[in-house]
C-alpha cells in the first residue's frame, strides 16, 4: 500500500458523524477559567453564495447582504447592467448544477472544491498567508493544513456523512499534497485532516461550533475550522439560500499575528419543558428564551444589555414565524429595553429563503461582519426548534474597523483573490484598501 493510500485508509476510519434531529440544538459544555468564560478568536472566514460577485471580497459580500455597503462608485458593471448588479440577487453559480441534473452529492462536491482549491496557489506562494507551506529556507514560517480539525454541519437525510467527510478530507490532502512522497517539500507532517460531521437542520451549525470550542480548549496550540453547507432548493440551480460557511477559529492565546475579526463564546439553549407555567409567570417559551439569551451572553462575557443587534432565522413568510418572532422579540425587548427589535434585527431567511443546515453559521458570519465594522455585540438566535431555543453571542474585536463609505473596496479584477477568505488585518501591515486581507 502506498503512502497516500495508507493516509486515506487511516483517515477514513477517523471520520465520525453525529446525528441530530432536523431542529436539534447543541448540548453546551463549558469549562470556565478564572479569567472568564472560554472564547475563541475568529481568525478568518469564508462564505460562498450565488449572490456574490467574484470581484468583490468576502468582507464586502457579508456587508452587502446586511445592506451596509454598496458597490464602488466607479463600478462599470453596475453602470452597464444595473438591473442585475444594483440589488441583492443571484448573479452567478458557485456550483454548476447542469439545469438541475447534478446530484445533491455532486453539487456538494463542487462547493467543497470551490472553497478548498482557492487556497492552493497562495498556500504555496506566500509565507505571510495564514496557512502556508511556502519557504523552503525557513519552515518556521509554515502553518500547515496537515491534521486540521474540521467540524462540519450538513443536512440530515440528504448526504452520506462518511462519504461527505471523506471527500472533504481527500480534497484537502490532494490539494495541498499532504504526505505525497512525490512532493516532499510540500509538507513536514503527513497527518490527514480530522473531519467530524454533524447531520441536522437549521441549528446543526451551533452543535459544530460548540464541538469546535471544545476542541480548541483541549488543543490550545491548534486552529479549527467550523463549516456548514446546504442547498435546500435543489434541484433548482443558483439559489441564494445555498450557503457554505467556513469559520477559522483559534484559542484566546493563540498567536495569529493578526487582529481577530470577532470573538465567539459557546452557544446556549434552554428547553421549554424545563420551565413551569402559571398565571403569575410568563409563557414557558419566553422563560426558555430568557434563559438561553442570558446564558449565551454570559458565555461571551457580556450582559444581555450589551446586545446591540440581533440576527435570527424566523422567516416572516413561514407559517410558524409569528410564534418564534414574537417570543424572541418579547425577550429581547425585556432584556435589552434600549434595543428597537424592528430596526435593530436582521431576518436572514426573509431575505435569502430557508437555508436548512446552512442557517446557523451563515448568521454567525453575518454577525462577525457586523461586529467587526459597527462595533456592537450581536445576538444570533436560532428559532426553528420552538421546544428548545438557542442563541450565541458575537463580540466585537478590541479595535473596530468603521466602514469608510467614501472609499472604494478592493476588487479582484483578475480573480486572483476571488473566493478567498476574509482575514483579520496583520499587525505588521497597515490597513489600506477596504476589503483587502491576506
Protein language model features and the residues they cover:
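Conserved "HGTGT" condensation-loop signature of ketosynthase/thiolase-family condensing enzymes
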Residues: 1-241, 245-438
Amino acid at each position: 500500500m502506498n503512502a497516500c493510500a495508507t493516509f486515506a485508509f487511516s483517515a477514513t476510519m477517523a471520520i465520525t458523524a453525529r446525528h441530530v434531529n432536523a431542529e436539534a440544538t447543541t448540548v453546551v459544555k463549558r469549562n470556565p477559567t478564572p479569567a472568564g468564560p472560554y472564547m475563541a478568536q475568529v481568525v478568518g472566514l469564508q462564505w460562498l453564495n450565488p449572490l456574490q460577485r467574484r470581484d468583490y471580497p468576502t468582507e464586502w459580500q457579508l456587508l452587502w447582504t446586511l445592506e451596509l455597503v454598496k458597490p464602488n462608485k466607479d463600478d462599470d458593471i453596475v453602470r452597464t447592467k444595473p438591473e442585475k448588479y444594483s440589488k441583492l440577487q443571484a448573479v452567478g453559480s458557485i456550483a454548476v448544477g447542469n439545469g438541475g441534473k447534478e446530484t445533491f452529492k455532486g453539487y456538494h462536491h463542487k462547493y467543497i472544491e470551490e472553497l478548498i482549491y482557492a487556497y492552493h496557489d497562495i498556500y504555496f506562494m506566500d509565507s505571510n498567508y495564514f496557512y502556508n507551506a511556502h519557504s523552503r529556507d525557513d519552515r518556521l514560517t509554515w502553518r500547515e493544513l496537515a491534521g486540521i480539525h474540521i467540524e462540519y454541519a450538513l443536512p440530515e437525510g440528504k448526504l452520506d456523512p462518511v462519504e461527505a467527510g471523506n471527500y472533504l478530507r481527500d480534497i484537502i490532502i490532494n490539494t495541498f499534497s499532504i504526505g505525497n512522497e512525490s512532493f516532499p517539500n510540500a509538507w513536514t507532517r503527513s497527518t490527514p485532516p480530522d473531519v467530524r460531521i454533524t447531520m441536522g437542520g437549521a441549528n446543526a451549525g451551533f452543535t459544530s461550533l460548540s464541538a469546535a470550542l471544545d476542541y480548541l480548549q483541549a488543543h490550545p496550540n491548534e486552529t479549527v475550522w467550523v463549516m456548514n453547507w446546504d442547498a435546500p432548493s435543489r434541484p433548482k440551480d443558483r439559489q441564494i439560500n445555498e450557503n457554505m460557511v467556513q469559520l477559522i477559529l483559534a484559542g484566546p492565546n493563540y498567536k495569529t499575528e493578526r487582529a481577530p475579526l470577532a470573538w465567539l463564546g459557546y452557544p446556549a439553549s434552554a428547553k421549554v419543558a424545563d420551565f413551569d407555567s402559571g398565571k403569575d409567570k410568563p409563557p414557558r417559551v419566553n422563560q426558555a428564551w430568557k434563559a438561553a439569551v442570558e446564558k449565551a451572553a454570559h458565555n461571551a462575557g457580556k450582559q444581555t444589555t450589551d446586545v446591540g443587534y440581533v440576527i435570527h432565522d424566523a422567516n416572516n413568510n413561514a407559517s410558524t414565524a409569528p410564534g418564534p418572532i414574537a417570543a424572541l422579540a418579547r425577550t429581547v425587548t425585556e432584556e435589552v429595553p434600549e434595543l428597537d427589535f424592528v430596526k435593530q434585527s436582521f431576518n436572514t431567511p426573509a431575505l435569502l429563503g430557508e437555508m436548512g443546515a446552512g442557517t446557523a453559521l451563515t448568521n454567525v458570519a453575518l454577525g462577525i461582519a457586523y461586529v467587526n465594522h459597527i462595533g456592537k455585540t450581536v445576538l444570533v438566535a436560532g428559532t426553528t426548534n420552538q421546544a428548545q431555543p438557542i442563541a450565541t453571542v458575537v463580540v466585537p474585536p478590541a479595535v473596530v474597523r468603521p466602514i469608510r463609505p467614501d472609499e472604494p473596496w478592493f476588487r479582484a479584477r483578475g480573480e486572483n483573490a476571488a473566493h478567498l477568505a476574509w482575514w483579520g488585518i496583520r499587525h505588521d501591515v497597515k490597513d489600506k484598501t477596504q476589503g483587502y486581507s491576506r
